[in-house]
A protein has these predicted regions:
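Active-site segments of SGNH/GDSL-like serine hydrolases
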Residues: 148-154, 165-200
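Solvent-exposed, polar/charged alpha-helical surfaces in well-ordered, non-transmembrane soluble domains
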Residues: 75, 79, 132, 163-170, ...
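Conserved SGNH/GDSL esterase-like catalytic core that processes O-acyl groups on lipids
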Residues: 54-62, 66-158
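Sec-exported extracytoplasmic/periplasmic mature domains
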Residues: 78-86, 135, 139-142, 152, ...
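Catalytic His-Asp segment of secreted/periplasmic serine-dependent ester chemistry enzymes
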Residues: 187-256
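Extracytoplasmic/secreted cell-surface and envelope-processing proteins
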Residues: 69-71, 127, 155-161, 190-196, ...
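Alpha-helical scaffolding within the catalytic cores
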Residues: 40-48, 101-105, 127-139, 162-171, ...
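N-terminal secretory targeting modules
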Residues: 1-61, 66-72, 82-99, 249-256
Length: 256
């Protein structure tokens, strides 16, 4: 058990240095000039993790409360990826009270190299908060391979979502040029026309070479059908969490 724990710690904070297929130093400085995706980052991650099974990998999730639940879609996605790749995986959840991560939680085991999953989902916070705390959300000794961005509900509804994420995206590309970025188009909010804020989001991200996982389209938009899938006006209920899990895992070509 001690050996396993040590392996998981290594997986949480360390990853190999590699050249990502869709990121480079130029993109870090001028993200709007990125070329369209040739292969989705999620599939590239899975293929690379299979091809180099002994090498550790690191995933980072930055976002709001929709990804923060300890029994929600994010850890479920982690467990499914761990099982598919036969890699041990551990995660830490961000705490907005301490502005730091909590204790490590194991998500799976396996004989191959470990995967660390930093869940920087911060309830009630926006992309600017992630930018301000980036040096703690992605510790100095971590080298992320895949960074998922899950923002929308806490952003300014009067400003295009893609525009609001630009400062964070630019900083991520500057600091982590070898990491692939993935943006999640969040599920609808009850009583709000979130479609207006996210209009053009997918095309804007695609133009920058950032894959979009479309959770929004997996949900109904009318309030009556949406209500059972939310535990409040925004955050998914257990049934909604399952839709999130299934949709995100499809992007990795992993069964829920």
């Amino acid at each position: 058990m001690v050996v396993c724990a040590l392996v998981l710690v290594v997986g949480l904070v360390v990853s190999s240095n590699r050249t990502a297929p869709t990121s480079d130093a130029t993109a870090a400085m001028t993200p709007t000039s990125s070329t369209p995706l040739e292969q989705p980052a999620t599939l590239a991650f899975m293929e690379d993790a299979k091809a180099h099974a002994a090498e550790p990998r690191t995933i980072v999730l930055l976002g709001d409360s929709t990804g923060a639940a300890r029994d929600g879609w994010a850890p479920k996605v982690g467990t499914a990826i761990s099982q598919t790749l036969q890699r041990p995986m551990a995660t830490k959840f961000w705490n907005t009270t301490t502005n730091d991560y909590g204790a490590m939680v194991g998500l799976g085991d396996g004989p191959n190299g470990p995967i660390g999953f930093w869940n920087g989902s911060a309830s009630g916070k926006d992309a600017n908060y992630a930018l301000e705390n980036l040096d703690k959300m992605i510790p100095a000794d971590a080298s992320p391979d895949l960074i998922m961005l899950n923002f929308g509900h806490t952003q300014d509804p009067k400003t295009a979502l893609a525009e609001q994420l630009q400062p964070l995206i630019a900083q991520l590309r500057k600091e982590y040029p070898n990491a692939d970025l993935v943006a999640i188009k969040q599920s609808p909010a009850q009583g709000k026309n979130t479609g207006e804020q996210t209009a053009g989001f997918a095309s804007a991200m695609d133009a920058e070479g950032i894959q979009v996982i479309d959770v929004y389209s997996a949900f109904p938009t009318d309030d009556a059908s949406l209500a059972p899938l939310l535990k409040d006006t925004v955050n998914p209920s257990p049934a909604g969490q399952q839709i999130w899990t299934t949709t995100v895992l499809k992007a990795f070509e992993v069964q829920a």
